[in-house]
């Protein structure tokens, strides 16, 4: 980072400055959720309701400048002046820029904070954002009028905060703790103004690093260092080259077009331009349940589900497995129906095994080529290995739910039949399979997928592959929202820790089996923690044909519990 220092601004005693300073001091020691932007309104609790102990009995008046006094400031709080100047972060990667923001905030690692996302207009999961970003840069002028901070080197939490930590993995209590107290504690607040240009290069942009750096240099020269700031035509020029340029100011009078005139208004209208933090968990040594809270906060910061969904998000962070297990796959080649795609081409045998998982929520599906010749098509289900707590009152083993029901397409309904290669050979029934009696808001309960089976209708050379699903009722729940997902994991860049990768399910094969691998899309269709709000269940699926391949598409739903 480059930092060109300027002189101190003359700071008059203004009502706005006094109010902002007082609010900044009251924010020190309060809880904060760092998935939010750095604004005082995101502090937890009422003003002055600190999570850490502050010596309140030895307050004093602070003389800040030219007789400007700030009365009744606790002895454990320091206040200092800052130096104005230009700062830049040269062209770097998504993760490098995220780490720069974290360093400014006193937070370790490179998982993006809320202030980073807010400045660069990121709203999705960081995995998707990082995959879509080629490079980032920023340049700006910072006017830090005052920096207030906790002077104590050793912070101590109030006892009621320590007692509020759940002693076990209880998603509801953990979510409540984070909502009430945040993830970190505010240790310093900087007030003043900043005028920053954020540059975001998308993956599709052909521009070299040198051209973006030249633009940054021009911005420094013309926007920040000339008496009358000149307009920069760069954003218009770069718009067609997949470069997003974002201008943001904080503090001062934003109606002033000129940077120089805007800077003069900052002392009379300062705002919060930076905050630093310390993790709450760093002050909880020896507290029962610390590891559970640490894990909950780490998951929350990494995936950033909406706070109102955090309980359900945490509840679904259970190990996942694929059914059938690899050890249970048949070693002996079974007798199967088959599909033929051309007169002389290889046959694709279809496993008609029913794959069921009982009362374990299904989160994904995939097609797989199996057997010694990789010529037998089967279907696999990804499921949670245990039942989330939120579902236990509705779906535990003692709860009567009735017999699960298989549902599939009509054999004679040829409207859904699509040829895989040629019309005179095998087809696929593309009929959507979903429980038609379940509607959004239905109070009688919902039906979710707990099993799947492939089958073949024998129409001579025009055999038809079809899908059946097993539906089980979940009483007392309703469907909140449903979506059909047509994006396989592999092509969307999503990551699923611990799950088999798409490459492992599409083995390199040769000869006839290699031809079959080109006909079957074995990409994993699933939703995990990176698919916000992170507690999706499978409620339907359908087979399809795309570009000569048999594909699987899945319907996911969120439940109201």
Swiss-Prot record:
One GO term of the biological process aspect: regulation of salicylic acid mediated signaling pathway
Record keywords, A-Z: Hypersensitive response, Immunity, Innate immunity, Plant defense
PROSITE patterns noted in UniProt: MACPF_2
InterPro entries to which the protein is assigned, alphabetical: CAD1/NSL1-like (IPR044663), MACPF (IPR020864)
Domain MACPF: from-to ranges: 11-314
Bias-annotated ranges (Polar residues): 500-513
Domain of life where this protein originates: Eukaryota
Region spans: Disordered: 489-514
Signal peptide span: none
Pfam (any one): MACPF
Disrupted-gene phenotype: Constitutively activated HR-like cell death phenotype with endogenous accumulation of high levels of salicylic acid (SA) and constitutively activated defense phenotype against challenge with P.syringae. Dwarf plant with normal cotyledons, but dark brown- or black-colored cell death lesions on the true leaves.
Function of the molecule: Negatively controls the salicylic acid (SA)-mediated pathway of programmed cell death in plant immunity.
Similarity remark: Belongs to the complement C6/C7/C8/C9 (TC 1.C.39) family.
Name of the protein this chain belongs to: MACPF domain-containing protein CAD1
Originating organism: Arabidopsis thaliana (Mouse-ear cress)
Gene name as annotated: CAD1
